[in-house]
Structure formats: C-alpha cells, structure tokens
A protein has these predicted regions:
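Acidic catalytic loop of the alpha/beta-hydrolase fold
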Residues: 27-28, 63-67
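Alpha/beta-hydrolase-fold enzymes
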Residues: 1-31
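Short beta-strand/loop motif that positions the catalytic acidic residue
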Residues: 52, 58-64
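Catalytic active-site module of serine/aspartate enzymes centered on a nucleophile-bearing elbow/loop
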Residues: 82-112
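Short alpha-helix in the alpha/beta-hydrolase fold that links the catalytic acid
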Residues: 54, 67-77
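Alpha-helical elements of Rossmann-like donor-binding domains used by nucleotide-donor carbohydrate transfer enzymes
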Residues: 38, 71-74, 105, 109
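Active-site nucleophile elbow and catalytic-triad environment of alpha/beta-hydrolase enzymes
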Residues: 30-49, 54
C-alpha cells in the first residue's frame, strides 16, 4: 500500500527541483504507508526522549514547507539545553541545494 508523493517547492534552485522530481532515481513518486508509520514512530520517540546536555547546532530555513520547523525548534530547544540555532532567512528544506547566496549563509553557520 502506497500514497502518491507530492513534490513541493522546497528549494530556490529550479534545476535541482526539476532533477529531484524527474531525474533522481532515488526519489520515489509513491511512498509506502510503512514509511509514514515509521515517521510517526520516530516522532513519538523524539518527543519522549529525555534530552541531552551535548551541544547541537541547528540550521533551519524560515521558508521550509516540508516539515513543521517551528514545532521542531521548540521541541529541540527543550530537549537540548546547549542548542544553538541559526535561522537562514529565505532558505527552504533542501539547504545544500539552495541558491548560492543562501548556501553561503548556510555553510557559514556550520560549526564543527
């Protein structure tokens, strides 16, 4: 059992979006219901996780329409006391496949 996948505009790079939808052999056009069940299970696991004192660096685009990033940021902030957040104005979900000006900001936010 599968569901039809909807490809959203989640990057500002039109060539990448075309590739993703029409040429990438690793992008399914139908999603197994088991994948959706696995995602729901993962959400429950992260919500029930006790958290961690380890520092994490979250890089998030403010036009990401693929996931509920506002909810995720709030949840991660509660779970990880040492979280730093870099919000990238105008960036979507596929951050490394964004326009060059956005990628520069994204890569500058990476802290090793």
């Amino acid at each position: 059992k599968t569901l039809k996948r909807v490809f959203r505009k989640n990057s500002h790079d039109p060539e990448f979006l075309y590739f993703l939808k029409h040429q990438d052999p690793f992008q399914p056009h139908r999603l197994p219901k088991a994948w959706i069940s696995a995602m729901a299970k993962w959400i429950t696991q992260i919500e029930n996780h006790s958290g961690s004192p380890f520092p994490i660096n979250v890089i998030q685009g403010d036009v990401d329409g693929t996931l509920d990033w506002q909810y995720n940021i709030e949840l991660l902030d509660k779970k990880f006391a040492n979280m730093t957040l870099a919000m990238i104005r105008g960036a979507g979900h596929h951050m490394v496949n964004e326009r060059e000006d956005l990628r520069e900001k994204i890569f500058a936010a990476i802290k090793l």
